[in-house]
Amino acid sequence: IQRPRTMYGVTKVTTELLSDYYFNKYGVDTRAVRFPGIISNVTPPGGGTTDYAVDIYYSAVRGEKFVCPIKEGTLMDMMYMPDALNAAIMLMEADPTKLIHRNAFNIASMSFDPETIFHAIKKHVPAFEMIYDVDPLKQRIADSWPDSLDDTCAREEWGWKPAYDLESMTVDMLEKLREKLKK
């Protein structure tokens, strides 16, 4: 997406372009990735478009019915926080002579819609329920994003590969949140 409409997207592209400028003009070793939605068991959801994918786990662990603000069938790329941290470290440690794209590496891990994550959780929490109450603003933002990102350059230039898929992330999220919310 080269013409983003959200403040996050605008500032991200601005940073990428400034980083390219400083690399080309002054030789500053700049590097950046384009993260998908990040799912964390440490940071609670803050109301962003992709935060439904964190909030749904909290609802499952608390035994609450989840009210999904994104409509069924809306695919979005997501990544578990341990993979995001690992990607940042891998890129920082990468051989600079092999980096062609430097400041605009797409990285991907998994792409799913609300139904898919719901069913992944339901395998472990059989009584879990979900209903939809679509937030028009969040849905517009979600609809403006690609369904999936091509991370071929990151894989080829610095060996990016995620460790988590939806199933392994779900097991870990449920385990960590059960422990966290017990306190």
What are these regions (language model features)?
Residues 4, 41-43, 138-140:
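A short acidic, helix-capping loop that chelates divalent metal ions and anchors anionic groups
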Residues 32-45, 55-79, 83:
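A conserved pocket-lining segment of Rossmann-fold NAD(P)-dependent short-chain dehydrogenase/reductase
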Residues 29, 65, 161:
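Residue-level detector of anion-binding/catalytic polar loops
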Residues 1-32, 39:
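Catalytic helix-loop patch of NAD(P)-dependent Rossmann-fold dehydrogenases
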Residues 13, 26, 39-54, 81-82, ...:
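Glycine/proline-rich active-site loop of Rossmann-fold NAD(P)-dependent oxidoreductases
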Residues 24, 58-59, 123, 156:
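Solvent-exposed polar/charged
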Residues 69-71, 76-183:
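C-terminal substrate-binding subdomain of Rossmann-fold SDR/epimerase-dehydratase oxidoreductases
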